[in-house]
A protein has these predicted regions:
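Intrinsic disorder/low-complexity signal
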Residues: 40, 431-432
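Hydrophobic packing positions in regular secondary-structure scaffolds
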Residues: 1-265
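Mid-bilayer segments of alpha-helical transmembrane spans in multi-pass integral membrane proteins
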Residues: 112, 124, 399-404, 434
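Extended alpha-helical regions
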Residues: 155-158, 433, 437-440
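Alpha-helical transmembrane segments and their membrane-interface boundaries
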Residues: 258-396, 400-404, 408-422, 426-431, ...
């Protein structure tokens, strides 16, 4: 495979400009579909359409699958429904085809489905479209090798050969009974190495790991991670085999989930990228910035209440960034750890008290170390015992409070069915800033009121 480089990109653009379809086709033939998709994503609509038309139908389907979702939608809007059905969808796996069709307007969906030549494929796609895209049923594919438990191994091999052209990879053969209920699996190695006279029921692996069609993506990801499998069958409520999810589909979902959580942790309210228009980017970024602004206003009002303290002890203003920043960092660390455990499913109800207690113990150690370091610093540079005590004691309390809130808030959000990933972002930072300033001012005022 030829790797996409800046030099190759320049060559490909030259072939497009000079209408050299032969060289463009020859170069595309030696490239991976992912690299072709990356190249086409950056082209104008007209050039992208021309580039796709020089590809064989099978490779067009692979390239379309790998393209950026928004860019794919733009390009497909220029392609007739019949062409989408016969040249693209027909050469896709059912799960990829369902994802593509689901992303289009409803009237285009019906037109494309009506033009798919393979009625069985069209029916399978319609079945997948009925599932929520964030469930196991929404990401499974229908392409798989299914055999009856009463068949012989030669019959199993014949079925594998018959379906081989429709499958990119064959990980397992799925064994069902007469009612289509999944009762076992056959790894490909077992099919190859067992004597040809064996009956399937005697060599299959019974009670395989399964997913249900209504399982959430979190459950799907957790199951793949827990059992370290490359493919897991999906069944309905009656145990009937409905499809299979492969590891490549899960990796795609994990990447999308990670990107979404990273954006939420950064204070973005929706999935955006640099190619989105100004209004969409503004709408995604502005809400949390406005909330942060309101938090800052409350913070300034809070500090204004203690203006008499600043008048008496101007030095304490030097440590406001230290108090606020340390509290925010500690809260972010604690919330991130809890959110990760919740995402992995390793934090159940029984472990919550122990987790909070463990986090508080860690916070006590961190608070003690930070407070002592700041106390030593102030001893040499500030030389005011009350300032030293006020800053160090405030840091100690703020670190413990921030750690507690960072652990508890994601748990509370998870309990009320709000994505706890949001708690790792500006929400924790704003709250810790307010708490930090209140603690700092209260302790400072109390110490100076008592000792001076």
């Amino acid at each position: 495979m030829i790797e996409l480089t800046p030099e190759l990109t320049k060559e490909l653009r030259h072939y497009l400009e000079t209408n050299d379809a032969a060289k463009l086709q020859r170069t595309f033939h030696a490239m991976h579909p992912t690299d072709i998709a990356t190249f086409i994503d950056d082209l104008s609509d007209e050039d992208a359409t021309r580039a796709l038309r020089v590809l064989p139908d099978v490779k067009v389907a692979d390239v379309i699958t790998e393209m950026d979702q928004d860019r794919r939608r733009e390009i497909l809007s220029l392609v007739p429904e019949q062409e989408i059905a016969t040249k693209i969808v027909q050469n896709m796996d059912t799960d990829d085809a369902a994802d593509l069709i689901r992303d289009l307007r409803s009237e285009r969906q019906d037109a494309i489905l009506a033009h798919i030549p393979d009625l069985e494929q069209a029916g399978n796609i319609v079945d997948l479209l009925h599932y929520d895209e964030d469930t196991a049923g929404g990401v499974m594919r229908k392409e798989m090798i299914v055999v009856n438990a009463n068949w012989s191994m030669p019959m199993c091999l014949d079925e594998m050969r018959r379906q081989a052209e429709e499958l990119d990879e064959i990980y397992y053969v799925y064994v069902v009974d007469d009612l289509k209920r999944l009762i076992g699996i056959l790894p490909t190695k077992t099919v190859i190495t067992n004597p040809s006279i064996s009956e399937i029921r005697y060599v299959m692996l019974p009670n395989p790991v399964i997913l249900h069609e209504s399982d959430s993506m979190d459950t799907v990801i957790k199951t793949f991670d827990q059992y370290d499998l490359v493919a897991i069958p999906v069944v309905d409520a009656l145990g009937r085999l409905k499809g299979v999810i492969t590891i490549d589909d899960v990796v795609d979902e994990m990447r999308e989930k990670h990107e979404a959580e990273s954006q939420m942790a950064s204070g973005l309210s929706s999935d955006i990228d640099t190619s989105d228009n100004i209004f969409k980017q503004t709408g995604a970024r502005l809400p949390w910035l406005l909330i942060g602004m309101i938090g800052g206003i409350f913070n300034s009002q809070l500090l204004g209440i203690y203006d008499s303290v600043f008048a008496m002890i101007p030095q304490i203003s030097l440590f406001i960034p230290l108090i606020g920043g340390t509290g925010g960092n500690v809260g972010m660390q604690s919330s991130t750890i809890v959110v990760q455990d919740l995402a992995r499913g390793t934090l159940d109800l029984k472990r919550i008290p122990r987790t909070i207690l463990n986090d508080l113990c860690v916070a006590l150690v961190i608070a003690s170390v930070i407070s002592m370091v700041v106390f030593v610093y102030n001893y040499f540079y500030i030389k005011d015992m009350l300032v030293m005590a006020s800053v160090s004691l405030s840091l100690f309390v703020v670190v413990i409070c921030a750690s507690l809130f960072g652990s508890v808030i994601p748990l509370l959000m998870n309990a009320v069915k709000i994505d706890p990933a949001r708690a790792t972002g500006p929400f924790i930072t704003i709250l810790d800033d307010l708490i930090g300033m209140f603690v700092y001012m209260t302790i400072t005022q109390a110490l100076y009121g008592h000792f001076r």
